[in-house]
Amino acid sequence: MRRNRAAPAGTVHSLSVDSGVLKSNRLGDPTTRDVPVYVPHDHDGAGLPLLVDLAGFTSGGPAHAGWKNFGENLPQRLDRLIAEGAMPPSVVAMPDCFTRLGGNQYINSDAMGRWEDFLIDEMVPEVERRFGCGGEGRRGLFGKSSGGYGSIVHAMRRPDCWAAAACLSGDMAFELCYLPAMPGVLRTLAKKDGSIETFITDFEAGPKWSGGDIHSLMTLAMAATYDPDPDPDAFCGIRLPVDMETCEIIEERWTNWLSRDPVVMADSHAGNLKRLRALWIECGKADQYNLLYGARRLQRKLAAAGVEHVYEEFDDNHSGLDYRLDRCLPFLAKALD
């Protein structure tokens, strides 16, 4: 979709949030975070719903507001959808939650940092104070992949804050999306004498990274998120849920991972989702990370629990899915308007 230059352009404001809760992160990541905030044309934001955009792994909110080839960035997409009357005017915050390990799952972790607390207790209040938007019953969040994971988990855990959520190809059914990557991670680490620290420091110093390196880093980030090593001397708080020599699952650690799996969490948190005004879940039928099967499992559990939601499957994989926002953004904004 090429940009519709006839659509009146909104304004992207630059906001900076100095976090107190992120100071405990073990990665050495910055605690002052940029938050581009989109306000529609001819509005100052007052009285509008607030949507929060959670970026996928290796990305961050500011990237969604930047120049884009062959298509629209997020503000331009919002301009078009609002101008066409497809969605009501809404304020959209695009926080920078990028980390040393390449991304974020947007939950609290002793290693990665208290990202759930940052978003809910620090960023949202600052955006609402500055623009007069959102408020109880008028906040939603959306994201794809890691951002989709963050959206559904926030909705499960904090319906007191969020009234609507969209999970696009979110991480779930961990035994299908994460365990298959473990042998490759071990092979990568074996080239560094099994040292996680050496791999990461070499990655940071290197002029170029392979796709395999990125995927290995992503798996290490998941380890720091779902099962941070309690040993304060562990580099970046990372330990894997498998034996480094045999790739056998270490049950105690893997159980910690599974406790953060949305499919597992649905057993105890589905009731919270009933408090939402709107819930959207979708996944591509050719998703290369096997996320379709997790989405189907989650959908069945929610249906059995009587949770109202929209569930869609579509003919595509995990990549280049920004066009799917044309479906879920109007859905969220209308529910919050």
Task: Label each PLM-derived region with a short phrase.
Residues 1-337:
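Non-catalytic cap/lid and distal C-terminal segments of serine-dependent acyl enzymes
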